[in-house]
């Protein structure tokens, strides 16, 4: 795969659906590409849920959706709590610290709160990359985030353009793409990914990978649906571990040079095959997610060590 033209959508879908191409063979192809660009290094990321449950959006996968009656709700946390998270991240060899807020988008006051905090964090931990995930932002807010030292902005496409309206109706696919493009225009590294397992087709999955290639996302988190009771997709079955591996491998082959991260839902979907995912992915979230728990940090560190890989610090 290294010495050929980039895959077309048609080729990628054929490979993804092929019953003749063994998943482990596909994973080996992806590993060749991953090793070429990233060696055996694994980037670590950590999330802080800085504002929870206060949201008017109706995303079908989300436990913080406006549709959810029972959910954890709190306003934007104090600056000291965000700074404490940065200290924990540094102590645990985390390379990127992600500050996440619920809601359609931040107020100017909330952006100022985040910016002041990031400026302080950067003085103490200049090597720690800061990723903000605040929703749909305005141009002037993006400029403030950049000036404060935010390195990366996460805004996931989540699904294909074709399937988008099955997932959420309170904002458009174009809203999401425009947010990613605005961050790029303001020299903030774009992080954008997907959630697989929401009832989308194989064609949708391949379309997601190509859409992320088209917007040139630097970092691509691949989430697998962890069904939450009461949400639109709460009754769906988990994906099989083997399908998850095929998805991760295809995202690597379609986006060979990008940081591919196994993210939310990896523990319950990949199960015992989690270590194999790092043959294609080169990045993971460590610790808990927004409202679902992750596995203990020690298990992730042991997994990396047992594979003969090393933390990219």
Swiss-Prot record:
SMART domains: BATS, Elp3
Catalytic activity: (4R,5S)-dethiobiotin + (sulfur carrier)-SH + 2 reduced [2Fe-2S]-[ferredoxin] + 2 S-adenosyl-L-methionine = (sulfur carrier)-H + biotin + 2 5'-deoxyadenosine + 2 L-methionine + 2 oxidized [2Fe-2S]-[ferredoxin]
GO biological process, one term: biotin biosynthetic process
All copies of domain Radical SAM core, residue ranges: 37-263
Cofactor note: Binds 1 [4Fe-4S] cluster. The cluster is coordinated with 3 cysteines and an exchangeable S-adenosyl-L-methionine. Binds 1 [2Fe-2S] cluster. The cluster is coordinated with 3 cysteines and 1 arginine.
Cysteine pairings via disulfide bonds: none
EC numbers: 2.8.1.6
InterPro entries to which the protein is assigned, alphabetical: Aldolase_TIM, BATS_dom, Biotin_synth/BioAB, Biotin_synthase, Elp3/MiaA/NifB-like_rSAM, rSAM
Cofactor: [4Fe-4S] cluster; [2Fe-2S] cluster
Molecular-function GO terms, alphabetical: 2 iron, 2 sulfur cluster binding; 4 iron, 4 sulfur cluster binding; biotin synthase activity; iron ion binding
Keyword flag DNA repair: no
NCBIfam families in the record: bioB
General function of this protein: Catalyzes the conversion of dethiobiotin (DTB) to biotin by the insertion of a sulfur atom into dethiobiotin via a radical-based mechanism.
Listed HAMAP family: BioB (MF_01694)
Name the UniProt record assigns to this protein: Biotin synthase
Source species: Staphylococcus epidermidis (strain ATCC 12228 / FDA PCI 1200)
Gene coding for it: bioB
